[in-house]
Amino acid sequence: MAKKSAVNRNERVKKLVKQYAAKREALKAIANDESLPLEERFEARLKLAELPRNSAAVRIRNRCEVTGRPRAYYRKLKMSRVSLRELGSHGLIPGLVKSSW
């Protein structure tokens, strides 16, 4: 089980990303629009830099829904390999069959 503080921190980051998503997207569009004057684009970059760092989507860490483990994460299942194997062995994941040869 992951530390609760790490899981909670990740939840706070997700909340911030959602809160600032529209503003960040608008500023990025202005900053990357080459038809605008250089000064205006630079202003947009400065405003973008003033936003909280944790409002960037790249700061979100994918974590297992079951244990909170940050590594070996399967995006499709939203869980780590350890949880997948454990739940699969107990037959709790539909369609997952243990291989044997």
Swiss-Prot record:
It holds the Pfam family Ribosomal_S14. Keywords: Ribonucleoprotein, Ribosomal protein, RNA-binding, rRNA-binding. The keyword Mitochondrion does not apply. GO terms for cellular component: cytoplasm; small ribosomal subunit. It comes from the Bacteria. One of its GO terms (molecular function) is rRNA binding. One of its GO terms (biological process) is translation. Signal peptide: none annotated. InterPro entries: Ribosomal_uS14, Ribosomal_uS14_bac/plastid, Ribosomal_uS14_CS. SUPFAM superfamilies: Glucocorticoid receptor-like (DNA-binding domain) (SSF57716). Part of the 30S ribosomal subunit. Contacts proteins S3 and S10. NCBIfam families: PRK08881.1 (NF006477). Belongs to the universal ribosomal protein uS14 family. Binds 16S rRNA, required for the assembly of 30S particles and may also be responsible for determining the conformation of the 16S rRNA at the A site. This is Small ribosomal subunit protein uS14. It comes from Phenylobacterium zucineum (strain HLK1).
